């Protein structure tokens, strides 16, 4: 299985006025639609452990305190096809129990259905990581999957 889990199974995006955001166990992805023809020099992006700010052509698009902490040194942004800015943030808490319910503390919350789908996806990703010989990319999950699902780590092998 060479492709990452999210490439095989898809992502659960949360739509916003400027684009969308989604998450994996380890990262949060922010995709911002910008005017076609935007150049990298038109973009100002500030990434800190708990804050993000993005302006394009002097117009503020996104600014605020993140839902949870990230590793500031590992955050990156790219301009893709001169029409989309992709920001990738690395979570400090990288487990299925750490499902972000919103991008910022007070904005861009996922609705309850999307939150549920995000939690299911992170739990399946956790199972994939714990059982690399199996392919969970097309699996469905029900039952106890909130907060990362059941903990089997202390069962006898």
From Swiss-Prot:
One of its GO terms (biological process) is protein folding. One of its GO terms (cellular component) is kinetochore. PROSITE patterns: CS. It comes from the Eukaryota. The keyword Phosphoprotein applies. The modification Phosphoserine is found at residue 142. The modification Phosphotyrosine is found at residue 145. The modification N-acetylserine is found at residue 2. Residues 134-157 are annotated as: Disordered. Residues 14-104 form the CS domain. Its main location: nucleus. It is found in: Chromosome, Centromere, Kinetochore; Cytoplasm, Cytoskeleton, Microtubule organizing center, Centrosome; Cytoplasm, Cytoskeleton, Spindle pole. GO terms for molecular function: unfolded protein binding. CDD domains: p23_NUDCD2_like. Keywords: Acetylation, Centromere, Chromosome, Cytoplasm, Cytoskeleton, Kinetochore, Phosphoprotein. Gene3D superfamilies: 2.60.40.790, Single helix bin. The keyword Acetylation applies. May regulate the LIS1/dynein pathway by stabilizing LIS1 with Hsp90 chaperone. Interacts with LIS1. PANTHER family: NUCLEAR MOVEMENT PROTEIN NUDC (PTHR12356), NUDC DOMAIN-CONTAINING PROTEIN 2 (PTHR12356:SF18). This is NudC domain-containing protein 2.
């Amino acid at each position: 299985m060479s492709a990452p889990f999210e490439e095989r199974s898809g992502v659960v995006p949360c739509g916003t006025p400027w684009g969308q955001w989604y998450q994996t166990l380890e990262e949060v992805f922010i995709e911002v639609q910008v005017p076609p023809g935007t150049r990298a020099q038109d973009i100002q992006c500030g990434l800190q452990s708990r804050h993000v700010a993005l302006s394009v052509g002097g117009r503020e698009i996104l600014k605020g305190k993140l839902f949870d902490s990230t590793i500031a040194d590992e955050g990156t942004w790219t301009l893709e096809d001169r029409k989309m800015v992709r920001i990738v943030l690395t979570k400090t808490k990288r487990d299925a129990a750490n499902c972000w319910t919103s991008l910022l503390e007070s904005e861009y919350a996922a609705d309850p259905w999307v939150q549920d789908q995000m939690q299911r996806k992170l739990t399946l990703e956790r199972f994939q990581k714990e059982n690399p010989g199996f392919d969970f990319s097309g699996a469905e999950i029900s039952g106890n999957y909130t907060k990362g699902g059941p903990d089997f780590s202390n069962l006898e092998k």
